Amino acid sequence: MNDALPSTDQGAAGPLIPVLAVVGVGLIGGSFAAALRRAGQVGRVLGVGRNAASLARAVELGLIDEAVSAEDAAARADLVLLSTPVGGLKNVLSRMLPHLDAATVVTDAGSTKAEVVDAAREALGERVGCFVPGHPIAGAERTGPEAADAKLYAGRTVILTPLAENSAASINQVRRAWQACGASVIDMDAGAHDRVLASVSHLPHLLSSVYMEQVATAADARTRLDLAGSGFRDFTRIAAGSPEMWRDIFLSNRDAMLAELADVRAVLDRAERAIADGDDVTLLALLDTAAQARRNWRKE
């Protein structure tokens, strides 16, 4: 964990979030708690998770003050962040529902939004207005509480996909929490979010993982890996992420993923034909377009 020491700069009015509950105290949830502590905008932090040892470690690291059940978190927290694999959100919300305080706001950090919104509606019913869907565009291949970084969200973008049932106050509370972490916050439609993220986040991870699996299972895998250099390292870095989390993301965003796979397969087929035919003009044009686009990309 980096820079997770608590700050005391809360101001006369006290912290923005008196009691925060984080469900899933790993890279995303742990960094959220650490960033709010660093900003002096959280009072007490409750941690919820499946692994008692991991929660105990989160307490040792100062990410959370105590480990509690999902039900207890729902009853006590002013804001709940769900940072678990998206496939498990419906179950967590169903457990929380009978215990949710009327003023409690719930948000998530899931990488897909349309299916998460559907799950929230099914789980929460008429209380769905307390759930403000969100997605921080930040992450790393590291996992667990040790991966938490108070600066993870500084300068990053967080996308909210508010529901018609959300109150302005609930949306603003989530927005201000992410801003306190150093992030810029924008709003998007859930479907548009999923289509864009399938292209620039989900598909790259799948391609990295598929390539890594192909190399790792080859008959001469040991030789290949021994000779691999920086290009291999850079391309496969994200394949080291949580398999459970990414499985859920791919399946949750199935339609958009299939559309993106069809598009990238068409380009791959074009490149394969150019190589097979010795078509240097087509191959050079493809590589030049890619190189120029990457060089002109505004972020690093």
Where are these regions (language model features)?
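Interdomain hinge/lid region at the active-site interface
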Residues: 221-290
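Short glycine-/small-residue-rich Rossmann-like dinucleotide-binding loops
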Residues: 84-86, 110-111, 136, 211
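Short secondary-structure boundary/capping segments
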Residues: 12, 71-72, 98, 123, ...
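Internal alpha-helical scaffold of NAD(P)-dependent oxidoreductase catalytic cores
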Residues: 152-237
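Rossmann-like NAD(P)(H) cofactor-binding subdomain of soluble oxidoreductases
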Residues: 95-146
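Conserved short alpha-helix immediately C-terminal to the canonical SAM/SAH-binding motif I
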Residues: 53-54, 88, 113-116
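Rossmann-like NAD(P)-binding element
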Residues: 70-107
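NAD(P)+-binding Rossmann beta1-loop-alpha1 motif at the extreme N-terminus of oxidoreductases
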Residues: 2-75
